[in-house]
Swiss-Prot record:
The lineage of its organism: Archaea, Methanobacteriati, Methanobacteriota, Stenosarchaea group, Methanomicrobia. This is Probable translation initiation factor IF-2. The gene is infB. InterPro entries: EFTu-like_2, EFTU-type, P-loop_NTPase, Small_GTP-bd, T_Tr_GTP-bd_dom, TF_aIF-2_arc, TIF_IF2, TIF_IF2_dom3. Residues 78-81 are annotated as: G3. It comes from Methanosarcina barkeri (strain Fusaro / DSM 804). HAMAP family: IF_2_A. GTP binds at residues 16-23, 78-82, 132-135.
Amino acid sequence: MADKKNLRTPIVCVMGHVDHGKTTLLDKIRGTAIVSGEAGAITQHIGATEVPIDVIINKLGDPRLRDRFIVPGLLFIDTPGHHAFTTLRSRGGALADLAIVVVDINEGFKPQTYESLQILKRFKTPFVVVANKIDRIGGWVSQKDLPFAVTFKKQSEDVQARLETKLYEVIGELYNQGFAAERYDRVTNFQKTLGVVPVSAMTGEGIPDVLMVLLGLAQKFLEANLHYSAKGPGVGTVLEVKEEKGLGATLDVILYDGTLKKGDTVVIGSLGKPIQTKVRALLKPRELSEMRYESKFKQVNKVTAAVGVKISAPGLEGALAGSPIRVANEDTLDEIVDQIKSEIDEVRIDTGAVGIMIKADTLGSLEALVHEFQKDEVSIRKAEVGDISHRDAIEASTVEDPLYSVIIGFNVKVHPDARDFLQESTVKVFTSDVIYRLVEDYQKYVKEQQEQAEKRIFETIIRPGKFKILPGCIFRQSKPAVVGIRVLGGVVRTNADVMLENGNVVGKIKGLQIEGENIPSAGVGKEVAMAIEGATVGRQIKEEDVLYVNVPERHAKVLEHEIYDSLSTDEKETLDIFLSLKRKDNPFWAK
């Protein structure tokens, strides 16, 4: 049996789409009624709640389980969607030990569900899927607070079948996202298969099962990671920087290693030099209370990992959410300042080279956003924490390439003076609180820009064309020659030079007509009258001759190397033949 004293509480992050029941789930676990006091029943602030093992065992309803679990409890991070998970970072990794992904079993997967899964996959974080709102399945008879296995047996066969159908829709979508999954009580190996727990956060059905699975995951896969140095200096992550009445700027911090004491010197990441300050007060949430309710705090002299704590200290205004916080002494201060500065610098980007600008609200979300754009091989000129400022807008407006005259903003505001400037500029701004939506929106914008650029090129470029002079269709022999032709490939346009298969340029298309009407161009399969200036029938050209539009070398390069994929099949074939004719004498033509 491991030493319980040096085993910290596992940190659990609750993720999922808005209104799918994250806060209600935590509310049920805590036995408080926070949701009812919040706007729109959506969690507004980052909070952390410590749920001791005794409370969990009580929920499970079997005191004999107490000896099976050695973790001291669970520390839940309560936050909108996946945001805290990215904020809770540790040198590029995830700080949360476990996660719950809440999905409405009736609505299925939504944008932030996919976002949560992508982030968890990236950080290899063990998690459980909670299929919530089973009480809304037609005909479901609720059995308050009972384990799922018990309440499921009390339902009719029709209702059981309906639940299984909805459950397997969730499991199927998880499979599509690259996860093997099964109903939790059918899983034989949680290392290979995700457990899906059907619950009703509203009635409490299935909640004991969620707690049981979380404790099991912590015990089985995390025990080695949960050992901490009780006597060592405190190490944590800033969740949020908050102004508090009577205290000024404070930090909500998750301490994940060591001990933090009142009076300790701490170093915290900021946009400039790391902040060095002394802890004036430590405010700890009481067990089973939310960090954000100040009246429920108690002042303490020290805290030990893992814990959510509010820190009051001078000079915290510039602290960054998502940045590290570490206790230092005289001997370690300089080293820790350098470490924290280098960690912030690793995430921030200021290359001055060509690329987009990224702004995010926390260091963790900036890191996640940069990762996603770099994965797509998007060049980034600048990436930093903070709202979109007037200076950012001016800087982006100096970029000529529309693909890079772009500001991406995750969970940030646009300053009013910046907004006024941007309305008059060509800078494109994308803001959202879903990372992959920002990536998708930018990809869509790039595609639109490329299509517009191609369209402009198509309008100005001479495209490949191949045609045959039809027998019995010589209407005029010269000045200009007027002949009937059939377009065999590509497109023929007025004012384009034409050549024979031997490479000789014989004249210029001066006009095209169909049934007496002048037309600017004719595509494959069309039979039209063509006026060719500079050619004489019987000398340079004759019936049955096959001719090609003589595409200029500069245009041929663009066609072959830049817009080839956008050409039609017959245009590609015509271009290929034309290039092979040109390269008989000069293999490097238009290369």
